[in-house]
A protein has these predicted regions:
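Basic, helix-initiating cap at the start of DNA-binding domains
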Residues: 1-46
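C-terminal peripheral helix-coil segments that are non-catalytic and often amphipathic
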Residues: 143, 147, 176-214
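Short secondary-structure transition hinges
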Residues: 111-139, 152-153
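Hydrophobic alpha-helical connector segments
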Residues: 72-116
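Hydrophobic/aromatic residues within well-ordered alpha-helical segments
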Residues: 15, 69, 94, 133-137, ...
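Hydrophobic alpha-helical bundle segments that form small-molecule/ligand-binding pockets
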Residues: 135-164
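Alpha-helical transmembrane segments of multipass membrane proteins
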Residues: 168-172
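HTH DNA-binding helix-turn interface
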Residues: 6, 30-32, 45, 52-64, ...
Length: 214
């Protein structure tokens, strides 16, 4: 039974990716507002009802890549090594992302990645939808921080929520600054040293204000 469940889940994830990548390709070619849900369904060779079983809105078709990262910060905190604090784990993870030129850090100069970011930040409805994803990232991280605090009888849930909001905001600002510089013509490798310096400074500031998680 578990094998059948795993197979179904893999098929489901493949369908998610197929529909989303098809949609993103169309959005990049024509523009978000010029592509209908029916266009995406036809290109992906699925019916509209099937498409809506996977994606609740047109915006979600474009933001599926962000959905993959929605609980990333929470997973980093829960998966940290013994003796590592939540903030240390998040700092390490972000710096590792910079080294890999992970698109989520903004430090990626691949033409398709840059085009996707232009699509995202140039489409008001996508920016608004992204705000909801950010909120869920904060909620997931707050829950993970609260769990970490309980392990050592630390601060209450409201403190965890405040901390999560600050951490997610810092990561977003760092990523947007990296993307802004790369979009202006700098290479990812050229921006990398400054990106690391900015990240180190930002996490130092977080440590001074978020002592329970540092």
């Amino acid at each position: 039974m578990s094998g059948e469940t795993g197979l179904r889940e893999r098929k489901k994830q493949r369908m998610y990716r197929t529909i989303s990548e098809t949609a993103i390709s169309l959005f990049l070619q024509r523009g978000f507002d010029e592509v209908s849900v029916a266009d995406v369904a036809a290109a992906a060779e699925v019916s509209k009802p099937t498409l809506f079983r996977y994606f609740a809105s047109k915006e979600d078709l474009a933001l599926h890549r962000f959905a993959d990262h929605e609980d990333e910060a929470a997973r980093v905190v829960r998966g940290r090594t013994t003796g590592e604090t939540p903030l240390e784990a998040l700092r390490r993870h972000f710096l590792d992302g910079l080294d890999r030129h992970d698109p989520v850090t903004g430090l990626n100069d691949d033409a398709e990645v840059l085009a996707f970011h232009r699509l995202l930040y140039g489409t008001p409805s996508l920016v608004a939808r992204l705000f909801a994803y950010t909120g869920r990232s904060e909620d997931a991280l707050a829950a993970a921080l609260a769990e970490a605090a309980e392990e050592k009888e630390g601060p209450d849930d409201i403190t965890a929520r405040i901390a999560a909001g600050q951490i997610i905001a810092v990561q977003r600002i760092l990523a947007q600054e990296n993307w802004r510089r790369v979009e202006a013509g700098a290479t990812a490798w050229g921006v990398h040293p400054d990106a690391v310096t900015a990240a180190e400074r930002a996490f130092t500031m977080l440590r001074s204000g978020l002592a329970p998680y540092a």
